C-alpha cells in the first residue's frame, strides 16, 4: 500500500472495522472493512502523519498520535477531522492515548508531560505543570479500575508515576533502566512493567 506504519498497531473502530495509521509524507488514517479488506476511507491527518498509537473512544472518535510537535488528531468514525488537536505544540511520538468510560482522553508527550482532555478536546489538566517526569516517546498511559493513571518514563528520570484522575501525583517508583512500554494492570490492581534493561517489574 505504500503506507509507512512503524510503531503503529491497528485498532478496531466501534463497528469493528480496522484502523491503520500512516506515518509517511502523506500522513493519514485509513479505515478498512473487516470482512473484505476494502478501504472504506482515508483521511489526511492534520499537521503531520500518524506517528504512534490509535485509540477509539466510546463515542467512536479516533485519536491518533501525530508526527512533529502536533499532538494528537481527533477523527470521527466517518473520517472527518475534528478541531482542535489535543496538545498541539507538544510531541506525541509513538505513544498511545488512554480513554476512560466518560470519554476523557489521557495522553503523554515526549517532553515528559501527561495531560487529560475531555471528549470535546478541552484540556483538563497536565502534570507536571512545568518541568519533566522524564522522556515519554513510547508506550503511553494506562488507567486503573479506580481511575488512577500510570505511565512509565525514560531518562533523565526513568520511573513509573501514578497520578490521580484529577492529575495529582500519588506515588512514583524509580527504575534502574528506561521504560518504553505501557504499564499493564492485573485483576488485583498490580502494575506490570518491562524496562529497557530486560527487567520485569511488578508493583
What are these regions (language model features)?
Residues 1-203:
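Extracytoplasmic/lumenal domain signature
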Amino acid at each position: 500500500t505504500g503506507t509507512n506504519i512503524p510503531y503503529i498497531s491497528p485498532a478496531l473502530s466501534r463497528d469493528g472495522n480496522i484502523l491503520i495509521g500512516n506515518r509517511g509524507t502523506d500522513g493519514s488514517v485509513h479505515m478498512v472493512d473487516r470482512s473484505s479488506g476494502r478501504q472504506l476511507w482515508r483521511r489526511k491527518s492534520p499537521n503531520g502523519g500518524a506517528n504512534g498509537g490509535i485509540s477509539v473512544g466510546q463515542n467512536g472518535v479516533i485519536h491518533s498520535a501525530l508526527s512533529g510537535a502536533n499532538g494528537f488528531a481527533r477523527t470521527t468514525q466517518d473520517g472527518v477531522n475534528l478541531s482542535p488537536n489535543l496538545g498541539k505544540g507538544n510531541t506525541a511520538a509513538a505513544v498511545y492515548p488512554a480513554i476512560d468510560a466518560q470519554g476523557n482522553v489521557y495522553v503523554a508527550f515526549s517532553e515528559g508531560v501527561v495531560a487529560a482532555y475531555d471528549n470535546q478536546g478541552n484540556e483538563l489538566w497536565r502534570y507536571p505543570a512545568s518541568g519533566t517526569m522524564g522522556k515519554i516517546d513510547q508506550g503511553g498511559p494506562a488507567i486503573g479500575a479506580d481511575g488512577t493513571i500510570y505511565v512509565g518514563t525514560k531518562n533523565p528520570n526513568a520511573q513509573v508515576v501514578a497520578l490521580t484522575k484529577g492529575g495529582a501525583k500519588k506515588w512514583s517508583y524509580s527504575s534502574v533502566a528506561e521504560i518504553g512500554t505501557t504499564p499493564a494492570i492485573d485483576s488485583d490492581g498490580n502494575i506490570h512493567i518491562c524496562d529497557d534493561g530486560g527487567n520485569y517489574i511488578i508493583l
